[in-house]
Amino acid sequence: MSAKRIVCLTEETTETLYLLGEQDRIVGISGYTVRPPEARSKPKVSAFINAKFDKILALEPDLVLTFSDLQADIAAELIRRGVTVLAFNQRSVAEILDMIHTLANIVGVAEKGRQLVAQMESGMKAIRNSASRFPTRPRVLFEEWNEPLISGIRWVEELIEIAGGIPVFPELRFQKNAPQRIVDPAAVIPKDPEVIIGSWCGMKVNKNKIRSRSGWSAISAVKKDHIYEIKSTYILQPGPAALTEGVMQLHAIFAHFNKMDVDPILRPGTLPNM
């Protein structure tokens, strides 16, 4: 199979195809796509959990790429209408790399896929080696949403460890669905995170709201003002951005915590909000 007309209903497959040099195959994208910027000129055919089916069909795709159970209803409807659908379900760093391999094979550029994966693995190895020189690996709370508080998304937890931190709720990474990763704010207090990182699914992180949570004034990250924001496009898409820009931003945060400079080759293109 070598799909020539592809609709990507999430950003990470769009970005992957661009990195593989196969962007001309893309005929439709999610309206939430921001990476790469030039992809925004493609026809927008969906949000995240709903899609414009007639618009998709009018594009005559030979493949539609979806993600996880969250887009299962979209996938089912497209299949009923005779469209070929491939649903990815990558939740870990290894699975993200597998997704890139798979997509490269589908479009007939397996060697480019291997090179891209090798480049990302090399970058993460360099960050892990750099992090090994930190005097302290801070305890880290990552928030993917604020009300309710949701934490522990697997690939982010793994990237935190690569970048030099220690997740305070490591057990949550094995829960695939967000409702299973809801955290009682009171349960955070005894964990005493030294760093809090917010990435609230496209909404700007309100640091004052974090500081004002009941009992959180006793938390080290709040007392010492180690509260940071990483925009969701860099970290919450399970794709190339998280394994490059996202992990570099995490590394920059932990270097800042340790009062250390980041090696210029590991410095992110966009700095997190510190």
Predicted region positions:
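N-terminal ligand-binding lobe of clamshell/alpha-beta domains
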Residues: 1-274
